[in-house]
Amino acid sequence: DRTASDSAALDSTIELLVRTKRSLPMAKLMTIPEAFAHRRDFPKKLKDLYTYANAVMESWDGPAAICGCHDQWAIAGMDRNGLRPLRYTLTNDFLIAGSETGMVEIDEAEILERGRVGPGQMIAVNFKEGKFYKDKEIKNKLSQSRPFGEWIKKIKHIDKLVQSVDEEFRDIQTSDLRRRMTSFGWTSEDMEIILHPMIASQKEAVGSMGDDTPIAVLSDNYRGLHHFFRQNFSQVTNPPIDSLRERVVMSLRTRIGNLSNILDEDQSQCDHLQLNSPVLSINQFKTLRQYMKDKVKIIDTTMDIQQENYHFKKELDRINKEAEEAVRSGYVHIILTDKSLSKSRVALPMILVTSSVHHYLIKKRLRTFISLNVQSAECLDVHYFAVLIGVGATSINAYMAQQAIAERHKKKLFGQLTYEECVERYIQSVNNGLLKIMSKMGISVVSSYRGGCNFEAIGLSRNLMSEYFPSMSSKISGMGLKGLEQKSLFAHNKAYSDDVINLPIGGFYRYRKDGEKHSFEGTSIHILQTAVGTNNYSLYKK
């Protein structure tokens, strides 16, 4: 039921699991597991159990304190962050669980134990055994119910598969790289203010608050599609997370492969590749491609502008149909790539393509059968990665950003850092940024953020939103698909018709004479100061 609440969806999922012979404690553990990835004090058997549970299905983040009863079990459990109160009272005859200790009047002489259920924990009663289980006891019981340690050996880790440093793209011609960058709207400002600090400090660049530039739809310059989206933040129910001090409960681990039947319980559910992060280097993406073998369908996301009657709508329909046919033909992975970009082929905005394919496959009820991997030249800053993941991307390779790093490294702009270290620091800075963005929504794991569309569009038409971004809202309507096409073609033709020696200056973050317009540019401020100093009203009006 699409109109049902999150709580109703969770209830329905747990009900489905218990009706297929899984115990209620196991159903709770699979749907709302404890944070374990960064904890060194976790017993191996419990780690094996949670690793298996994460391989079977994506987890709920909460906040939630749940109580349930089915068959011979009654349970009470908490979400991984412990963001709801849950206390219990055990008597000679009863177990009472709820948000407060004193909900029910009980004779103190009857009370055996009082306590609280912590983050990710649960308590349980088995009616058949007549036994009360604390958190460690019930989880030890579950961890011994199946050979989970043997099953999870089928999970492959990408770091163990990477064998050598990939030299691909390292020697790309500077002129060709400049044209590609210009066609996507990159500027020298992006290189100096965005990319360089990410490698130098392993963090996003820090800037002052406020934005006095036009919103993307009103700008005269080409702005990437990610500029049309604003990140949502938690309000009322979901408290934000501190991504620095509460890192232990957060994870970017990503599984690559078909989601198996969640109703099964065997080792086949662990046959997939695990990534430590959805952000991949060129070398890691090449390794991923080798792992996929013949189970991958590569879809070109560029458009031939030499053919007659070309337009974005036609290309998006083609891409969607190719994706559907791939799933129905038994492919397990899809790669969306714009590597075919050339003078005669313009790249469609990757955010638009990814969202289109993701939602199209959801409508056809095929999305869970495939991983949606993106190889994008447009991707540079953390916000772009966040939007791509938010509209459904499983993994992302920003290959042109890595080419830009290689070019700057040749010029010795990163000091004593090796090229490999620069790439690692760039990916780490993106990872840190993704955790920060997720934390603003109170989301702990990237699988909960993926496809969640936690953004609000500004300046995109409602027809465009309803067709390609149906899970998002656009409070201010504006540019449609035709407008995006015209902007992309203008930037592309400009890049490939002119002799591009240097990137455009930009002027988005700092005012430049030939760059983006600013409300508070130098000339206006100078006139204002002069008008105030000379008490000149006519100059003030100017």
What are these regions (language model features)?
Residues 378-392:
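Catalytic cores of alpha/beta
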Residues 17-64, 68-72, 99-103, 131-313, ...:
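Flexible, glycine-rich loop/tail regions that form catalytic "lids" or insertion modules at the edges
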Residues 346-372, 425-432, 436:
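Alpha-helix-loop-beta-strand connector modules within alpha/beta enzyme cores
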Residues 1-19, 78-82, 89:
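N-terminus-centric sequence/structural signature that marks the extreme N-terminus
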Residues 123, 338, 388, 445:
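Conserved, mostly hydrophobic/aromatic
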Residues 128, 339-341, 377, 393, ...:
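Short, ordered loop/turn segments at secondary-structure junctions
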Residues 1-2, 104-109, 369-374, 403-424, ...:
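Short beta-alpha connecting loops at secondary-structure transitions
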Residues 58-96:
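Conserved catalytic micro-motifs used in adenylation/nucleotidyl-transfer and phosphoryl/amide-
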